[in-house]
Amino acid sequence: MAVLPTSGHPHSYLITGGASGLGSATVDAVERYGGTPLVIDKNPPSRDIAHVCANLADTEAVEKAVAELADVAGGSFEGVFTAAGIDSCGKLEDVPAAQWEEVLRVNLIGTAAVVRAALPYVRAGRGRIVTCASTLGIKAVSDATAYCASKFGVVGFTRALAAELAGDVGVTLLIPGGMDTPFFDGRSAQYRPPSTARLAKPEQIAEMVLSAFAQPAGCELRELVVCSSEEASWP
């Protein structure tokens, strides 16, 4: 069980993609353990949570959203989790260039933009950063060039960031396998998990995010590969 740090005031956790899927599960977990979630998402959360609607592909909008939520939090974040992500399945030559590039802008550039903007507030809160990659960030598959490129990028970005911030801000790379979330909704049948697929529950992965946030000063969970015990994408 995660135990979030306490210091006599509510701790605030910035979560991208917090309106659905893993992000929403992490919002619930933060509240369950006594923290205050703050959400950036292109869609509003289904319940009353402090949030700003923004497209992570728009760096200027991201910077404004982070600053606005930092004001709500009193100028500090105890944690940042970059859960937002999109995909555009298909062979490279079949995916329109604009869609392909949007995946990289949201998943990779958006992750970096959020972390860059949030870093002063994370330092102020002596907080931690958890980025979200994927098992497809360490194992490539066909018809996923945009997603794999973006998530391999998140892996490299986070490893470099951890080295850059060592001893200053804790950084954890989360590498989840397939999850039972709306992420697969709207895909053609060939790109959806089969009915027999063993997918992790987002609530389980969210617990691991909070475990990273809850580590004592000087102790880092550098990388977490978390998936169903029968996950097909890893190893």
Give the role of each language-model region.
Residues 167, 173-174, 193-234:
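C-terminal helical subdomain
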Residues 19-20:
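Conserved glycine-rich cofactor-binding loop
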Residues 120, 162-164:
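Alpha-helical segment proximal to the catalytic Tyr-Lys
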